[in-house]
Amino acid sequence: MDVLHRLAEILEQRKTEAPDKSYAASLYAKGLDTILKKIGEEATETVIAAKDGEPGKIVYEMADLWFHCCVLLAQQGLGPDDVLRELGRRFGMSGLEEKASRKLG
């Protein structure tokens, strides 16, 4: 099983754990606004790392961003497969075609 799927399983388990026992459980307990704030913070840190041109720092911050995005997905009843399906749908489609397809529904 790949890391994203294992993480998704663990994040599902954390939904039922005590907030003082798990960082992810504490995020779930604090609610959507806290999760969204963390994603914003991690996205900003990723942008700064990229601007600084430090590959190791970019990967580190991107891992934090992906983690918090996975928390959001789980909180919303979604998972990595939902995102991977959407990426698969877009694969081979130009960016302009994809953008136009959003207008169609």
Swiss-Prot record:
It catalyses: 1-(5-phospho-beta-D-ribosyl)-ATP + H2O = 1-(5-phospho-beta-D-ribosyl)-5'-AMP + diphosphate + H(+). SUPFAM superfamilies: all-alpha NTP pyrophosphatases (SSF101386). Disulfide bonds: none annotated. Pathway: Amino-acid biosynthesis; L-histidine biosynthesis; L-histidine from 5-phospho-alpha-D-ribose 1-diphosphate: step 2/9. GO terms for molecular function: ATP binding; phosphoribosyl-ATP diphosphatase activity. Keywords: Amino-acid biosynthesis, ATP-binding, Cytoplasm, Histidine biosynthesis, Hydrolase, Nucleotide-binding. One of its GO terms (biological process) is L-histidine biosynthetic process. Its main location: cytoplasm. Pfam families: PRA-PH (PF01503). It is found in: Cytoplasm. InterPro entries: HisE, PRib-ATP_PPHydrolase-like. HAMAP family: HisE. Belongs to the PRA-PH family. This is Phosphoribosyl-ATP pyrophosphatase. It comes from Methylococcus capsulatus (strain ATCC 33009 / NCIMB 11132 / Bath).
